[in-house]
Design a protein with these regions (language model features):
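Generic structural signal for small/hydrophobic residues in well-ordered secondary structure
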Residues: 8-11, 46, 89, 98, ...
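Structural recognition of alpha->loop->beta junctions
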Residues: 112-127
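Short, acidic loop-to-helix structural element flanking the phosphoryl-transfer center
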Residues: 66-97, 108, 136
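Active-site neighborhood of HAD-like aspartate-dependent phosphohydrolases
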Residues: 1-41, 45, 51, 55-63
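Short alpha-helix immediately C-terminal to the canonical SAM-binding loop
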Residues: 107, 163
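Conserved Lys-Pro-Asp/Glu-containing loop-to-beta segment of HAD-superfamily phosphomonoesterases
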Residues: 132-160
């Protein structure tokens, strides 16, 4: 058995909620996708606060910040089967860890708003470190914090490029 299972959050525990909202809300979103991704990249590197992220994405989408927040919250559906499985793994002594690209304030808000704060033994966020997956340094940092070797953990992500 592994000593730790390391999960991405968005796309694994719940959809990539802001992207899903953007696709549903913005007409001809493909023409604005590169700009959206550039905003997300700055946020993932910790160079953009969540408030500024919301302002920029709302402006790009042509909606109010309030509509953006409400829309994104409506996209947040937690994978409860995965949560139950993680609780089982923790009960068996396996550390449950989150490594995700995103800001501290936003990711922890989603985690805590959905009662998942105690699920994770460790949460590592790209915005805190300025290191974005798939950069190996974010995984090395996580393993060091856990005090384990790479062979003692498995990583689960919705994007193959990150594994």
């Amino acid at each position: 058995m592994y000593k730790a299972v390391i999960f991405d959050f968005f796309g694994v525990f719940c959809p990539d909620i802001t992207l899903e909202w953007f696709k549903k809300t913005v007409q001809e979103y493909e023409s604005k996708l590169a700009d959206f991704q550039e905003i997300c990249t700055r946020s993932d590197y910790g160079k953009l606060s969540r408030a500024d992220f919301n302002k920029e994405v709302a402006a790009l989408a042509g909606v109010s910040v309030g509509d953006l927040i409400a829309g994104v919250e409506s996209e947040t559906v937690i994978n409860n089967s995965l949560v139950a499985y993680c609780k089982k793994l923790r009960a068996e002594g396996c550390a449950i860890t989150c490594v995700s690209n995103g800001t501290h304030e936003w990711t922890l808000q989603v985690i805590n708003d959905h009662g998942l704060g105690r699920l994770f033994d460790l949460v590592v966020l790209s915005g805190d470190l300025g290191i974005v997956k798939p950069n190996p340094e974010i995984y090395k940092y996580t393993l060091k914090k856990l005090g384990i070797k790479p062979s003692e953990a498995v990583f689960v992500d919705d994007r193959e490029v990150n594994t």
